[in-house]
Structure formats: structure tokens, C-alpha cells
Amino acid sequence: MFLLRFTVMKSFRPKVVSSLGFKIRLFLAVFVLNFTVAKADDNHVFTDTIPIVERYGHILMPVTINHERKQLVFDTGAGGITLYGDKKPFKTKWISDWFDAKNHTKALEEGIMLVEFGSQCDSLPVSYAPLPSDSTLRAALLNIGDGLMGFCPLIRRGLNYFVKVDLRKGIMIVSNDHKWAKRTKGLRVSYKKCDVLPSFSIKVGKRHRTRTALDSGASHFCTIRTSVLDKWEKADKEFKACKAFDDSIEDNAGLFDTAIHKRRVKAYKCEFAIKSFKVGDAVIMDDPSGVTSVGEEIFHKAVIAFDPWHRKIIFQPYDK
């Protein structure tokens, strides 16, 4: 009986030791793997400095699409990446009522392309906007750049880029270093989600506040709905002290409009402020279409950093 018991215990002992050893080895392997991954994350920080090409006030960012170099307007008002030109044979196609509600004849071709920002490549959806070859709009748009690059592609990418635009130095810094934003001083402004323009509260004149969007593709400094400006002008004596004048501006009309047109606007020279970021004698224009936004001219006043990871925009005014 004793011999049988000893034999049974002896036969089971190696399995117990083997199981315990396996657990220890598994624990050590997981620990080493976690340490290696954490260390790899710290070491795989991507930062690239891209020279800015500025044309007609717009910021052009060099982007490689399917091994072709493109100069795309960095447009926070755009939802994705859009190229101007002829239609390309993509697998997917959709028609939007937004630009052709009557005839449904115009389509925006969309497909997956190899897109490179600096030295990082990804396959991203790219849209092709068909433009008539003889249109003045096509000629004007192609004179500015090859297309639009919105803020959303930077948000949707796995690297979650920070983008810092510095027109004074003529550079755009693109990075996935999450510590970088913490080291960047300035005003932080939140936005909600990718398909909504980054917005913030502004102050016009002495007392009027409104929420507006940052549209880096717009050529104006700031536009506010005509009805709002009329209300301020009638009800506020201090706002009347702002220098009002009529002006004619040249609009790059909507992407699918037929021509570029000039329109008369009512403009004001007022104090413009985003919290601590102030611009004296800024030109505030009315917009009959009801679009309220701050355009690309604000880039000439401050270094602006886009932080999609923390959903912030950082304004860093130039030292006077």
C-alpha cells in the first residue's frame, strides 16, 4: 500500500512541477512582452518637418498619393482628402444631393489610395472632384493647389498626428509624440468630433461673443452671419464705434459652383479676441450665406497647433 501510494505521488510530481514551471515561464514572457511593447511605443515617435508652400494665402502641404507628389491645401473645413481634376476609375462611387439636388448628374469618385505624409504611408480614402476642363473654377482651383486635405485624415489615422503650423518659419511640424502638445504653450480649444469643424468662442468689439469655426481653407479673417452683425449694430452704441466700411471680396465659391464671383460685403474693423489671443483692428465681415468662421489669415497672427489626440487646438501668438 505504501509502495503504491509512493509510486502514485511520484508519478504525479513531475506534472505539478512542470505545470508550475510553465506558469512561471508564461508570466515572465508576458512581463517581458509588455516591457518591450511599452519601450517600443516610446521609441517609435515619428516627427517630420515639412516646408510650407503658401499660395494666395492658403497653406499647401506636400502629400504623396499613389507615388505622385501633390500640393494639397490644408483645409480644416474639408472632411477628407479631395483631388481636383478628371474622374478616376474607382471601385466605389456615390452621389450627394448637397451639390446636385436637381439632376443628380455629378458624382464624387472615392477610392482607397496609398497616401504618404512625410515618411509615413497609409491607405486612406481619397475623393476625386470632377471639374469641367474649360471652367474658370477649375483653372482658379488648380492655380492654388491640387486638392484639399482636411483635418479628419489626421484624426482617423492610427498615429493621431499633432500638426503645428508656423507661417513665420515657413514650416509644418507633423508628429505623433503625445508629450509634444503638453510642452506647447498657448490657448487650448476643444472640438467634438471629426465631421464637425473645430470651434471656439470669440469676442468682437467690447462685449459681443459668439461661437465660430476655424476654417483654414477660407480666405477671409472672420465672417459672421449678416443678421447677427445687423443686430449688434442696431442695439449697441459701442459696436457702432467700430469702423464700418463696404468692401468687395473675391470668393472661391463652393467646389461645385460654376464660377468664381465677386460680392459686396459689409465689413467692420474691430477688436477681435479668442480669450487671451487678441488682434486689434481685425476685419470682421458679414456673410449672407450664414457661415460663421475664422479663415486662414489667422495663421499669420500665431503659431497654431492641431492636437487631434487630445481634441484641442493650441494658439500660440507671436511675440510682438
Show where each model-derived region lies:
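Bacterial Sec-dependent N-terminal signal peptides
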Residues: 1-44
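Pepsin/retropepsin-fold aspartyl endopeptidases
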Residues: 40-320
